[in-house]
């Protein structure tokens, strides 16, 4: 689509068709760049030398004499999408490697698991405590700058930690440095994770959100599958400081990729200016607006409520399944590792089928069906004792969970206006991460009282009840839509 001058050009064969309708979109400025309708010749040639190179999205519809319609659109080309995916790859390489390496460093330094728990809380608590105001801030900021500065902070934090580790400071100094860096980066990750979902809307059309989200999740799951294997080999031969510096370099590369993108992501609502008290009042007001917006948009609220309840009911399943495999089925650590590798591949497989599901069915249909399939295979997991059957059931469970994550994100991007997307995303993250803690407590109590098998069986019954509630809620919502129309 790009000519020698770097501007957008397009040629499409139209043999067998009589009329054509063609649109070119400028995603940088959110405008329709060009539009044509006419009779087909041998091909359509768009003369767009005056257009910006940022014009990279198009849709063409061809009409035949017999009424047959052909529709085609462009998703990924050389340019912003590929550069963004480079940023995602480097970001996930750094995050996955640090997620694997940091616990090993802490255990080697202290020999105590309590420090791991504290560090884990530093990674999740910022979402609970700061998610809502940070989401409001993101909605008033240039999201590209938020992403690049977040990557810069992570680079600086891990580079500092690498220096401390390389200097072979005493354990106390090193542990304090790990605490401080983890806390700062935990807060930074709130900004980054909220911004990246909003940022996609600036250069990807709504019809392609699902594709981009599935690719991003595919990269994440692939990194989560491969990096521990590489990290395990590297940790024994590469110094801690150098490994940490490699992680830091990944975030520097991610920031550089974002800077190379030709995307305008201007501030919403004028940014945050003026005295600190006024800015705080603005953030509080914006947060309230986000909550009010979510309450009035039930089509956005229902998925949050259903997903939150689902997380409470299934939050402890991974722990229960591990106990069942080790204690009830007497699997060796090698067998458990094999099963976990298969389940990770299930999560990756989910990223490949989610686009087909999104194209073929409504969101609520996929959501409800997902609950039902997960219920069935969680119950089947309890029924089997063979390692291959256990691996197969958990493969499907993780596949469904992957699909669930992507469809919820895509649905939110499709339904929420860009000016509210940061706030709504932060509400989703704060709620869903918060209820995970409740899920661990609730599921752990059931497991401790009745045993892990019975806890999983009971969660299956609860998921069935939740599914019925979801069917009723969406039936009522669809009835109201029909009445309004």
Model-based region annotation:
Residues 76-81, 264-304:
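Juxtamembrane intracellular "pre-TM" segments in multi-pass secondary transporters
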Residues 83-100, 120-138, 142-156, 177-235, ...:
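Substrate-agnostic recognition of the 12-TM MFS/MFS-like secondary transporter fold
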Residues 101-114, 319-334:
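Short amphipathic helix-loop junctions that connect adjacent transmembrane helices
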Residues 103-109, 162-169, 226-246, 327-328, ...:
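Transmembrane alpha-helix termini and helix-breaking/packing motifs in multi-pass membrane transporters
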Residues 107, 160-169, 185, 257-258, ...:
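MFS-fold secondary transporters
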Residues 129, 140, 146, 150, ...:
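C-terminal transmembrane bundle of multi-pass solute transporters/carriers
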Residues 163-181, 382-394:
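Helix-loop junctions at membrane interfaces in 12-TM secondary transporters
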Residues 198, 202, 244, 248-276, ...:
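Helix-loop junctions on the cytosolic side of multi-pass membrane transporters
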């Amino acid at each position: 689509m790009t000519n020698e001058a770097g501007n957008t050009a397009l040629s499409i064969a139209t043999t067998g068709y009589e009329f054509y309708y063609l649109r070119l979109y400028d995603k940088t400025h959110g405008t329709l760049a060009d539009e044509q309708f006419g009779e087909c010749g041998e091909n359509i040639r768009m003369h767009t030398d005056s257009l910006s190179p940022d014009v990279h999205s198009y849709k063409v519809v061809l009409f035949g004499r017999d009424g047959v319609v052909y529709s085609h659109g462009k998703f990924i080309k050389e340019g912003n999408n590929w550069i963004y995916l480079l940023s995602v790859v480097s970001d996930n390489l750094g995050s996955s490697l640090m997620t694997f390496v940091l616990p090993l460093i802490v255990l080697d330094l202290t020999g105590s698991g309590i420090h791991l728990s504290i560090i884990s809380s530093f990674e999740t608590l910022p979402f609970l405590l700061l998610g809502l105001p940070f989401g409001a801030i993101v909605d008033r900021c240039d999201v590209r700058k938020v992403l690049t500065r977040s990557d810069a902070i992570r680079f600086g934090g891990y580079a500092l930690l690498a220096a401390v580790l390389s200097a072979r400071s005493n354990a106390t100094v090193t542990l304090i440095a790990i605490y401080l860096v983890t806390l700062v980066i935990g807060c930074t990750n709130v900004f980054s994770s909220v911004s990246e979902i909003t940022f996609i809307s600036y250069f990807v059309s709504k019809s392609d959100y699902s594709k981009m989200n599935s690719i991003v999740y595919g990269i994440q799951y692939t990194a989560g599958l491969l990096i521990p294997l590489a990290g395990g080999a590297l940790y024994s031969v590469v110094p801690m400081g150098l490994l940490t510096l490699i992680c830091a370099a990944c975030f520097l590369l991610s920031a550089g990729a974002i800077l190379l993108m030709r995307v305008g992501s201007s501030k919403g609502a004028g940014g945050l200016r003026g005295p600190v008290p006024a800015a705080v009042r603005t953030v509080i007001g914006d947060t309230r607006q986000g909550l009010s917006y979510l309450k009035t948009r039930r089509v956005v609220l229902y998925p949050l409520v259903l997903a939150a309840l689902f997380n409470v009911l299934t939050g402890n399943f991974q722990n229960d399944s591990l106990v069942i495999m080790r204690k009830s089925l007497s699997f060796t650590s090698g067998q458990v590792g094999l099963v976990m590798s298969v389940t990770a591949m299930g999560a990756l497989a989910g990223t490949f089928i989610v686009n087909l599901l999104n194209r073929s069915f409504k969101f609520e249909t996929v959501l409800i069906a997902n609950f039902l399939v997960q219920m069935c295979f969680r119950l089947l997991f309890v029924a089997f004792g063979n390692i291959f059957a256990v691996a197969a059931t958990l493969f499907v469970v993780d596949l469904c969970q992957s699909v669930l994550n992507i469809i919820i994100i895509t649905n939110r991007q499709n339904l929420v206006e860009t000016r509210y997307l940061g706030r709504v995303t932060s509400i989703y993250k704060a709620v869903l991460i918060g209820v995970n803690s409740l899920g661990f407590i609730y599921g752990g109590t059931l497991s401790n009282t009745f045993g892990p098998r019975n806890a999983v069986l009971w969660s299956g019954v609860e998921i069935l009840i939740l599914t019925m509630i979801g069917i009723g809620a969406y039936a009522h919502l669809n009835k109201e839509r029909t009445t309004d129309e």
